[in-house]
Amino acid sequence: MTVKHLIVCYDVEKTKDRNKVIKVLEYYGLIRVQYSVFMGSLTETRLHQMNARIKREFTKPSIKILVIEVCNACMERALLVHEELPKVNRQFEVI
């Protein structure tokens, strides 16, 4: 099972919409590292589910969400100044 590391950034004007984006990202186990940036790791299946949900639920042009897959080597070199990066969240899917 392949685990994908992610960085998700968003720009959402309305508080109600922004809170909904945050709840979805937290539901999938992503961790907030900056005000509008989350990171974490998901299985390919969970990543596809999250992306489908984001596309389905956030259709307003004013809601901008960027999901970036990050390779293992890049995650190892990542630096978060003045804080520690959250431990990579390894999630497993029971089939």
Swiss-Prot record:
- GO molecular function ontology, one term from the record: metal ion binding
Please describe what this protein does: CRISPR (clustered regularly interspaced short palindromic repeat), is an adaptive immune system that provides protection against mobile genetic elements (viruses, transposable elements and conjugative plasmids). CRISPR clusters contain sequences complementary to antecedent mobile elements and target invading nucleic acids. CRISPR clusters are transcribed and processed into CRISPR RNA (crRNA). Functions as a ssRNA-specific endoribonuclease. Involved in the integration of spacer DNA into the CRISPR cassette.
Which co-factor is required?
Mg(2+)
Endoplasmic reticulum: is it a keyword of this entry? no
The answer, when asked if Metal-binding is one of the entry's keywords, is yes
Entry's HAMAP family? Cas2
Specify which residues bind Mg(2+) according to the UniProt entry for this protein. D11
Can you tell which superkingdom this protein's organism belongs to?
Archaea
Organism whose genome encodes this protein: Methanospirillum hungatei JF-1 (strain ATCC 27890 / DSM 864 / NBRC 100397 / JF-1)
**What EC number(s) does this enzyme carry?**
3.1.-.-
Keywords, A to Z?
Answer: Antiviral defense, Endonuclease, Hydrolase, Magnesium, Metal-binding, Nuclease
User: Which Gene3D superfamilies does its entry note?
Assistant: 3.30.70.240
Assembly information from the UniProt record: Homodimer, forms a heterotetramer with a Cas1 homodimer.
What does the entry give for GO biological process? defense response to virus; maintenance of CRISPR repeat elements
Protein family (similarity comment): Belongs to the CRISPR-associated endoribonuclease Cas2 protein family.
Q: What is this protein called?
A: CRISPR-associated endoribonuclease Cas2 1
